[in-house]
Amino acid sequence: MMHGTAARTAIIGQLALVVAGCTQMGNSVPASNSTSSTSGLTAEQTAGGWRSLLDPSLAQWRGYKQQTVPTGWSFANGVLTKTGSAEDLVSKDQYGNFELAFDWKLPPGGNAGVFYRGTEEYDHIYWSAPEYQLLDDARHPDGKSRLTSAGADYAVYPSPAGVVKPADEWNSSLIVVNGNRVQHWLNGQKLLEYEIGSSDWEAKVKASKFVAYPNYGRASRGYIGLQGDHDGTLQLRNVRIREIK
């Protein structure tokens, strides 16, 4: 992540998320070839409570502490693209307990992230929100540490090696948040699980740079965020959410 101061076919992607969705906290993500032309979701996904967060208008997003979508973000052919350094995007809605699924692709040396349960109390969303790290492990310096490699809960919980696909290939990710329990999945494999507020979590946060921000990770409800402040390109597709009731 290194903050500053301030294809696979659709069928393969769906099959990966079928495995990813089979968690202790959430139900499986249904797979199908019958895709809705308006939402980008399959009929089974829609029936199962999934909702797409992407459409050409980007009406479900805005800039962090802004009212509109900032320069640098665009949507075409089902793909959300960030070009160059841009302000972070946040969802207009807030979410508490949910499954968030998405496909992502980075160029060689690429670096980005997806935040969850973020607030706008600080200057940057990453001071309040845990981050699912997106990274080209092979070429970016952050890939030298599992704490900051692809799929990690950035700088707090490490991810295992050998799961992320090479640069310029699509990866499929799933984040499951239910109460204080969180899971990160990548390409059908569970990477990590942690409990917010546990003694282990408290110790890890205390040992991280986030100790400077008392409310880091503590919101029970917040925004989904897409990191834009690094140079380079980020591509996202099939971004969808299912709230856990």
Where are these regions (language model features)?
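Bacterial N-terminal signal peptides that target proteins for export
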Residues: 1-13
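Carbohydrate-interacting regions of secretory-pathway proteins
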Residues: 23-245
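C-terminal motif of bacterial Sec signal peptides marking the signal peptidase cleavage site
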Residues: 19-21
